[in-house]
Amino acid sequence: MAPLAEVGGFLGGLEGLGQQVGSHFLLPPAGERPPLLGERRSAAERSARGGPGAAQLAHLHGILRRRQLYCRTGFHLQILPDGSVQGTRQDHSLFGILEFISVAVGLVSIRGVDSGLYLGMNDKGELYGSEKLTSECIFREQFEENWYNTYSSNIYKHGDTGRRYFVALNKDGTPRDGARSKRHQKFTHFLPRPVDPERVPELYKDLLMYT
Protein backbone atom coordinates (compact mmCIF):
# COMPACT_ATOMS: atom_id res chain seq x y z
CA MET A 1 0.00 0.00 0.00
CA ALA A 2 1.39 3.37 -0.97
CA PRO A 3 2.36 5.58 1.98
CA LEU A 4 -0.07 8.31 2.88
CA ALA A 5 0.81 11.95 3.33
CA GLU A 6 1.29 12.98 6.90
CA VAL A 7 -1.36 15.11 8.49
CA GLY A 8 0.81 18.18 8.09
CA GLY A 9 0.07 18.01 4.38
CA PHE A 10 -3.40 16.54 4.80
CA LEU A 11 -4.62 19.47 6.85
CA GLY A 12 -2.93 22.06 4.71
CA GLY A 13 -2.93 25.41 6.42
CA LEU A 14 -3.50 24.30 10.00
CA GLU A 15 -0.72 25.73 12.10
CA GLY A 16 -0.22 24.50 15.65
CA LEU A 17 -2.00 22.95 18.56
CA GLY A 18 -1.01 26.03 20.51
CA GLN A 19 -3.48 28.06 18.45
CA GLN A 20 -6.98 27.74 19.81
CA VAL A 21 -9.97 27.79 17.47
CA GLY A 22 -13.16 27.86 19.48
CA SER A 23 -12.98 24.90 21.85
CA HIS A 24 -10.52 23.03 19.63
CA PHE A 25 -6.75 23.10 19.28
CA LEU A 26 -5.09 22.62 15.92
CA LEU A 27 -2.25 20.21 15.15
CA PRO A 28 1.41 21.25 14.92
CA PRO A 29 3.50 20.60 11.80
CA ALA A 30 3.97 16.95 10.86
CA GLY A 31 6.58 15.15 12.93
CA GLU A 32 6.13 17.28 16.03
CA ARG A 33 4.33 15.95 19.08
CA PRO A 34 1.29 18.07 20.01
CA PRO A 35 2.11 19.97 23.22
CA LEU A 36 0.06 19.04 26.24
CA LEU A 37 -1.76 21.77 28.07
CA GLY A 38 0.42 21.10 31.10
CA GLU A 39 3.52 21.93 29.05
CA ARG A 40 2.39 25.49 28.55
CA ARG A 41 3.39 26.40 32.11
CA SER A 42 6.91 27.70 32.50
CA ALA A 43 9.53 25.58 34.23
CA ALA A 44 9.49 28.01 37.16
CA GLU A 45 5.74 27.60 37.55
CA ARG A 46 6.02 23.82 37.50
CA SER A 47 8.86 23.87 40.02
CA ALA A 48 6.90 26.13 42.35
CA ARG A 49 4.06 23.65 42.46
CA GLY A 50 6.23 21.08 44.27
CA GLY A 51 5.39 17.38 44.58
CA PRO A 52 2.21 15.63 43.41
CA GLY A 53 -0.35 16.08 46.15
CA ALA A 54 -3.89 14.74 45.86
CA ALA A 55 -5.15 18.18 44.85
CA GLN A 56 -2.67 18.30 41.97
CA LEU A 57 -3.68 14.86 40.73
CA ALA A 58 -7.34 15.83 40.89
CA HIS A 59 -6.56 19.02 38.97
CA LEU A 60 -5.23 16.92 36.09
CA HIS A 61 -8.71 15.58 35.41
CA GLY A 62 -9.46 18.78 33.53
CA ILE A 63 -6.05 19.50 32.01
CA LEU A 64 -5.87 16.70 29.47
CA ARG A 65 -8.47 14.95 27.42
CA ARG A 66 -7.23 11.57 28.52
CA ARG A 67 -9.86 8.88 28.48
CA GLN A 68 -10.47 5.15 28.42
CA LEU A 69 -12.55 4.09 25.44
CA TYR A 70 -15.11 1.54 26.59
CA CYS A 71 -16.92 -0.50 23.93
CA ARG A 72 -20.45 -1.83 24.41
CA THR A 73 -19.03 -5.32 23.90
CA GLY A 74 -17.42 -4.97 27.35
CA PHE A 75 -13.81 -4.08 26.50
CA HIS A 76 -11.59 -1.03 26.72
CA LEU A 77 -9.68 -0.30 23.53
CA GLN A 78 -5.90 -0.36 23.98
CA ILE A 79 -2.94 0.36 21.70
CA LEU A 80 0.03 -1.91 22.40
CA PRO A 81 3.72 -0.98 21.85
CA ASP A 82 4.03 -3.52 19.01
CA GLY A 83 1.40 -1.62 17.03
CA SER A 84 -1.46 -4.05 17.62
CA VAL A 85 -4.87 -2.90 18.81
CA GLN A 86 -7.11 -5.01 21.02
CA GLY A 87 -9.63 -4.85 23.82
CA THR A 88 -9.06 -5.46 27.51
CA ARG A 89 -11.47 -5.91 30.40
CA GLN A 90 -8.93 -4.37 32.78
CA ASP A 91 -9.91 -0.98 34.15
CA HIS A 92 -7.12 1.60 33.88
CA SER A 93 -4.83 -0.61 31.81
CA LEU A 94 -1.74 1.45 30.93
CA PHE A 95 -2.19 0.72 27.23
CA GLY A 96 -5.86 1.65 27.47
CA ILE A 97 -5.24 5.24 28.59
CA LEU A 98 -5.77 7.30 25.46
CA GLU A 99 -5.22 10.94 24.63
CA PHE A 100 -7.79 12.59 22.38
CA ILE A 101 -6.55 15.43 20.20
CA SER A 102 -9.08 17.66 18.48
CA VAL A 103 -8.05 18.25 14.88
CA ALA A 104 -11.10 20.24 13.81
CA VAL A 105 -14.79 20.28 14.62
CA GLY A 106 -15.87 16.64 14.79
CA LEU A 107 -12.41 15.28 13.91
CA VAL A 108 -10.04 13.69 16.43
CA SER A 109 -6.86 11.68 16.60
CA ILE A 110 -6.39 9.12 19.38
CA ARG A 111 -2.97 8.43 20.89
CA GLY A 112 -1.97 5.75 23.37
CA VAL A 113 -0.28 7.60 26.23
CA ASP A 114 2.02 4.72 27.24
CA SER A 115 2.77 3.28 23.79
CA GLY A 116 3.02 6.70 22.14
CA LEU A 117 1.26 5.30 19.06
CA TYR A 118 -1.70 6.80 17.24
CA LEU A 119 -4.77 4.75 16.44
CA GLY A 120 -4.93 4.18 12.69
CA MET A 121 -7.16 2.36 10.22
CA ASN A 122 -5.98 1.21 6.80
CA ASP A 123 -7.95 0.84 3.58
CA LYS A 124 -8.93 -2.72 4.55
CA GLY A 125 -10.59 -1.53 7.74
CA GLU A 126 -7.82 -2.93 9.97
CA LEU A 127 -6.84 -1.09 13.15
CA TYR A 128 -3.18 -0.54 14.03
CA GLY A 129 -0.87 1.70 16.05
CA SER A 130 1.08 4.27 14.05
CA GLU A 131 4.28 6.06 15.09
CA LYS A 132 3.36 8.99 12.86
CA LEU A 133 0.16 10.98 12.73
CA THR A 134 -1.14 10.41 9.20
CA SER A 135 -4.47 10.87 7.49
CA GLU A 136 -5.30 7.27 8.44
CA CYS A 137 -5.22 8.41 12.07
CA ILE A 138 -7.99 11.00 11.76
CA PHE A 139 -11.47 9.90 12.85
CA ARG A 140 -14.92 11.39 12.82
CA GLU A 141 -16.32 11.50 16.33
CA GLN A 142 -20.11 11.21 16.32
CA PHE A 143 -22.31 11.46 19.40
CA GLU A 144 -25.14 8.96 19.07
CA GLU A 145 -28.65 9.07 20.51
CA ASN A 146 -27.90 6.28 23.01
CA TRP A 147 -25.17 8.42 24.66
CA TYR A 148 -22.37 6.39 23.09
CA ASN A 149 -19.89 7.69 20.52
CA THR A 150 -18.88 6.24 17.18
CA TYR A 151 -15.51 6.77 15.48
CA SER A 152 -15.26 6.39 11.73
CA SER A 153 -12.38 6.83 9.31
CA ASN A 154 -12.21 10.27 7.80
CA ILE A 155 -10.88 8.97 4.48
CA TYR A 156 -12.17 5.43 3.97
CA LYS A 157 -15.74 4.60 3.02
CA HIS A 158 -17.66 2.34 0.67
CA GLY A 159 -17.76 3.80 -2.80
CA ASP A 160 -21.23 2.52 -3.62
CA THR A 161 -23.07 3.53 -0.43
CA GLY A 162 -20.79 6.16 1.09
CA ARG A 163 -20.87 4.25 4.41
CA ARG A 164 -17.70 4.88 6.37
CA TYR A 165 -15.40 2.37 8.03
CA PHE A 166 -15.95 2.28 11.80
CA VAL A 167 -13.66 1.57 14.73
CA ALA A 168 -15.10 -1.57 16.37
CA LEU A 169 -14.31 -4.36 18.84
CA ASN A 170 -15.75 -7.87 18.65
CA LYS A 171 -17.39 -9.69 21.55
CA ASP A 172 -14.06 -11.37 22.34
CA GLY A 173 -12.14 -8.08 22.36
CA THR A 174 -10.45 -8.52 18.99
CA PRO A 175 -10.60 -5.62 16.54
CA ARG A 176 -13.49 -5.93 14.10
CA ASP A 177 -13.16 -5.27 10.38
CA GLY A 178 -14.08 -1.61 10.02
CA ALA A 179 -15.35 -2.16 6.48
CA ARG A 180 -17.97 -4.60 7.81
CA SER A 181 -19.02 -2.52 10.81
CA LYS A 182 -22.05 -0.26 10.88
CA ARG A 183 -23.11 2.66 13.03
CA HIS A 184 -26.10 0.90 14.62
CA GLN A 185 -24.07 -2.13 15.77
CA LYS A 186 -22.92 -2.38 19.39
CA PHE A 187 -19.40 -3.25 18.15
CA THR A 188 -18.98 0.39 17.09
CA HIS A 189 -20.43 2.06 20.20
CA PHE A 190 -17.88 3.52 22.59
CA LEU A 191 -18.12 5.44 25.83
CA PRO A 192 -15.18 7.70 26.74
CA ARG A 193 -14.54 7.08 30.44
CA PRO A 194 -12.56 9.42 32.71
CA VAL A 195 -9.07 8.55 33.89
CA ASP A 196 -8.13 8.73 37.57
CA PRO A 197 -4.51 10.01 37.70
CA GLU A 198 -4.04 8.30 41.06
CA ARG A 199 -4.61 4.92 39.39
CA VAL A 200 -1.90 5.50 36.76
CA PRO A 201 0.46 8.13 38.28
CA GLU A 202 3.36 6.97 36.08
CA LEU A 203 1.55 8.43 33.06
CA TYR A 204 1.52 11.88 34.68
CA LYS A 205 5.14 12.13 35.81
CA ASP A 206 6.09 14.41 32.93
CA LEU A 207 3.43 16.88 33.99
CA LEU A 208 3.99 16.71 37.72
CA MET A 209 7.79 16.82 37.42
CA TYR A 210 8.46 14.09 39.95
CA THR A 211 10.13 10.68 39.88
UniProtKB/Swiss-Prot annotation:
Gene Ontology BP terms: cell-cell signaling; fibroblast growth factor receptor signaling pathway; inner ear auditory receptor cell differentiation; negative regulation of neuron apoptotic process; neurogenesis; positive regulation of cell population proliferation; positive regulation of dopaminergic neuron differentiation; positive regulation of ERK1 and ERK2 cascade
Region Disordered, residue ranges: 31-53
A GO MF term: heparan sulfate proteoglycan binding
UniProt feature, compositional bias: Basic and acidic residues: 38-48
Keywords: Growth factor, Secreted
Classification via PANTHER family: FIBROBLAST GROWTH FACTOR (PTHR11486)
Family: Belongs to the heparin-binding growth factors family.
Disease linked to the protein: Renal hypodysplasia/aplasia 2: A perinatally lethal renal disease encompassing a spectrum of kidney development defects, including renal agenesis, bilateral renal aplasia, hypoplasia, (cystic) dysplasia, and severe obstructive uropathy.
Protein name, entry field: Fibroblast growth factor 20
Lineage: Eukaryota, Metazoa, Chordata, Craniata, Vertebrata
